[in-house]
């Protein structure tokens, strides 16, 4: 276990059970491949959270989630380009028969499609190209050889937190005391 991450802001019905994470749950893990960080599910829609990770120079961005649609695929490709990092999308596959027997809402479960969450796990490079294509409608372990030299090469072109930044005009402050 490299680190622990709590979701910064629970989404929708998650708020009934969980509260906001505090600033100590915004970790970046040091690995032999460079800093690695994660935002969970819709945290990746939080621009300031993404920039906080980009400013730490992450070459690897991991996102466990349940977004199984083409719009999410467009989002992760954008994030990979924006952050000039590899985006590892860990999307679950969930079928109706995976619900435990005896839940209090069998009629609602019965109306669900056979495949509730289609997956879509994949890896995207810093230029927004798929290293592995999304895997739909089945469980799979995806493997990819990543050319980490793509990260600094892509940042030579555009580095929103480096040579292309304007800290005299725009600044992000992260309270991680």
Regions found by a protein language model. Name each.
Residues 28-30, 79, 113, 133-134:
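Short secondary-structure boundary/capping segments
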Residues 63-64, 90:
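Generic beta-sheet signal
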């Amino acid at each position: 276990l490299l680190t622990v991450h709590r979701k910064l802001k629970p989404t929708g019905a998650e708020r009934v059970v969980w509260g906001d994470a505090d600033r100590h749950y915004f970790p970046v893990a040091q690995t032999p491949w460079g800093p690695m960080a994660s935002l969970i599910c819709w945290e990746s829609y939080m621009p300031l959270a993404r920039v906080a990770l980009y400013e730490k120079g992450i070459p690897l961005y991991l996102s466990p989630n349940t977004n199984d649609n083409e719009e999410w695929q467009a989002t992760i490709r954008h994030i990979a380009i924006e952050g000039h990092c590899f985006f590892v999308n860990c999307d679950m596959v969930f079928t109706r028969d995976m619900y435990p027997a005896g839940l209090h809402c069998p009629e609602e479960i019965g109306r669900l499609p056979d495949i509730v969450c289609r997956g879509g796990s994949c890896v995207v490079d810093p230029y927004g190209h798929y290293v592995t294509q999304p895997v739909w409608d089945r469980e799979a372990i995806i493997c990819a050889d990543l050319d980490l030299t793509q990260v600094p090469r892509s940042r030579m072109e555009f580095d929103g937190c480096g040579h292309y930044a304007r800290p005299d005009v725009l600044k992000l402050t992260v309270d991680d005391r």
